[in-house]
């Protein structure tokens, strides 16, 4: 197997595994985690009192992995852009997130969007321009889902890299904190893929 492809699989697999390991502990303090689970050493079911994923089965992934896979899918579809570089259309991403949220609600999931993403997408749903709604996003949403950007776009061309990261942040996390955190995660992934 091509080493870059193997590392890409590893990056996505690592994202999903880390997400599944952390799923039962979302939004819990260290004391709450110890009280509910003791010392976690593997995949466990979420407790019924878990605020975001009550009763979720061990090994289940959250919106972190699901949103990353949405970005990966959009990047694959955008590969034929005129620039020849991986491309993520921010407006299309906003509408894809809305459709994903609707499907999660229909399936009865409580593990939906974080506060910054939710607030921005409510404005999109109300008819606002998707490229103008992310100015208050200071949570971790952009960083948690950016792994596919790091896989698809090398840091070798910083301008193209920054543009790709920005396109994944703009709709929900168009802030310095949102962009910088996503850029750091994507850069670490990109350098790992490039074996830098």
Annotated model-derived regions:
Residues 1-196:
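Structured, active/binding-site neighborhoods that engage oxygen-rich ligands
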